[in-house]
């Protein structure tokens, strides 16, 4: 059964570890992540961007697939199904479809409008026993076509949004989506520390977990990050394993072209990446 992410992230904050949000793109992604979470006895958050939701035919299809897998793969660890970087309209659709958690990305609105829309969603999520993530300061890189520069959020704006009744907060601290450029300045721990001091027990979220050095992630977790998002790294490992299979000509041996065989190395590569991240975040055996 799907659960909201609130409880698992409160536990993570208190226990000084982070729960991974791993974005799903199809059946292979979802199955690989769920099986690894079960194997590692770790709570997990399945992230769905609006683009990925559309690709998988729609949010109801995603909910049906995930619920079916939870039952038939006998998954017993806590699993949240979370809309990643949702528009206001996308959030409402996910509430209706049966997601257990949503992120409202109002970072491109003026702060007053971001506050007003966040307040409405706080009320809706409370009625549906769902968790709500909000964002302050745009995260850099590209997320479904939206490009941000990796700015640092204003800690006072973070407090204003945190006080609205959301469950966890994503704040820009110099992090970006996708591959990090060679001239990246690193995470601003000063900003993170200031946000943590103003928001107290609020679990904080680190977007763009791919490419951030392990030591920086560990410091961020010590400073209050309880949820770390990973997407690009799983995509890269899946692509590399699939390329290796095809370049070795394995798709031309016997029935190697069968999609179940063709996609198997990529699925195994996702499992290995997810396990490595769960160990880094400290969530193994925390289910």
Language model: regions and residue ranges:
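Alpha/beta enzyme core
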Residues: 3-11, 15, 27-52, 59-76, ...
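Hydrophobic alpha-helical scaffolding
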Residues: 23, 228, 232, 260-267
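Short catalytic-loop micro-motif centered on adjacent basic/acidic residues
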Residues: 19-23, 81-82, 103, 204-207, ...
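Short, N-terminal intrinsically disordered low-complexity segments that are rich in Pro/Gly
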Residues: 19-26, 52-55, 263
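Extended, intrinsically disordered, low-complexity segments
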Residues: 246-287
């Amino acid at each position: 059964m799907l659960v909201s992410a609130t409880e698992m992230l409160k536990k993570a904050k208190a226990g000084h570890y982070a729960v991974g949000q791993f974005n799903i793109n199809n059946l292979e992604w979802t199955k690989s992540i769920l099986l690894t979470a079960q194997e590692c006895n770790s709570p997990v958050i399945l992230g769905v961007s609006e683009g990925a939701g559309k690709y998988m035919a729609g949010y109801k299809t995603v909910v049906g697939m995930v619920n079916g897998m939870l039952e038939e793969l006998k998954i017993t660890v806590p699993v949240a199904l979370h809309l990643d970087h949702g528009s206001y309209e996308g959030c409402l659709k996910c509430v209706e479809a049966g997601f257990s958690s949503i992120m409202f990305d109002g970072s491109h609105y003026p702060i007053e409008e971001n506050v007003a829309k966040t307040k409405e969603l706080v009320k809706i999520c409370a009625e549906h026993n769902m968790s709500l993530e909000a964002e302050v300061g745009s995260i850099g890189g590209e997320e479904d076509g939206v490009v941000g520069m990796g700015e640092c959020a204003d800690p006072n704006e973070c407090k204003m949004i945190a006080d609205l009744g959301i469950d966890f907060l994503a704040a820009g601290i110099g992090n970006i989506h996708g591959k990090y450029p060679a001239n990246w300045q690193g995470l601003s721990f000063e900003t993170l520390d200031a946000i943590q001091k103003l928001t107290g027990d609020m679990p904080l979220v680190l977007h763009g977990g791919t490419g951030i050095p392990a030591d920086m992630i560990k410091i961020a977790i010590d400073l209050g990050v309880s949820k770390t998002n990973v997407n690009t790294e799983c995509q890269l490992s899946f692509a590399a394993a699939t390329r290796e299979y095809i370049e070795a000509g394995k798709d031309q041996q016997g029935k190697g072209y069968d999609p179940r065989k063709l996609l198997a190395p990529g699925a195994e590569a996702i499992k290995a990446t997810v396990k490595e991240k769960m160990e880094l975040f400290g969530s193994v055996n925390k289910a």
